[in-house]
Design a protein with these regions (language model features):
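N-terminal G-site helix/loop of the GST-like fold
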Residues: 1-11, 172
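Anionic-ligand binding patches
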Residues: 23-185
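A short beta-strand-loop structural module common to alpha/beta enzyme folds
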Residues: 10-18
Length: 185
């Protein structure tokens, strides 16, 4: 997503344990995982590191990525007609003026689903779009038809709150080069 606004990035996977700890609140969970990812990558790189983790939560329960069509249908039935939160924690690590910099932020977006009838639910699950998606839907795809309202960052729901990340980059690194689609920064 950052490449679309002209930033040049390198992706370095972080091998961290993403299991939820007993009694861990969703906000604490995404913050812990984003921080662990940032530290894991920073140990292998001298570049600025941006790490993030996103989850879907309803009534304080974390909704992960369903493994089966049945799990996807169960999640979607639970979300049907209700407002849930998409939480993303991101961490920026780097150096500025020979001093270490760490910036952590949590972004929350409220998403309200329409009431899903049986046919709509069955059709969406049959599409397979839910695979690999926390909360069992993808707002950037046909899952957009399941969403009535979004309050907050739409790009957060897609996977990364771009405006908030760019603001944080400007805060910790200073002015960024010109941002334009297709123009590397």
């Amino acid at each position: 997503m950052l490449e679309r606004i002209g930033l040049v990035i390198e992706v370095h996977p972080a091998d961290v344990d993403e299991n939820v700890l007993a009694g861990e609140a969703p906000e604490a969970y995404v913050a812990r995982i984003a921080h662990a990812k940032a530290i894991a990558v920073a140990r292998r790189s001298d570049l600025w590191v941006l790490a993030a983790d996103t989850t879907v939560t309803l009534d304080g329960t974390i909704l992960g990525k369903p493994d089966t069509p049945e799990e996807a249908a169960k999640m979607l039935r639970w979300l049907s007609g209700r407002t849930h939160q998409v939480l993303t924690a991101f961490v920026l690590l780097g150096e500025r003026d020979d001093s270490p910099v760490i910036h952590e932020r949590l972004v929350s977006t409220d998403v309200t689903m329409i009431e899903l009838d049986g046919a709509m639910l069955a059709d969406y699950v049959a599409s397979g779009e839910w695979r690999g998606k926390a909360g069992a839907y993808a707002i950037q795809g046909i899952g957009a038809a399941l969403v009535r309202e979004v309050h907050g960052s739409v790009t957060n729901v897609i996977g990364l709150p771009i405006a908030e990340v760019v603001a944080a980059l400007r805060e910790v690194r200073g002015p960024l080069p010109r941002l334009a689609a297709g123009t590397p920064a």
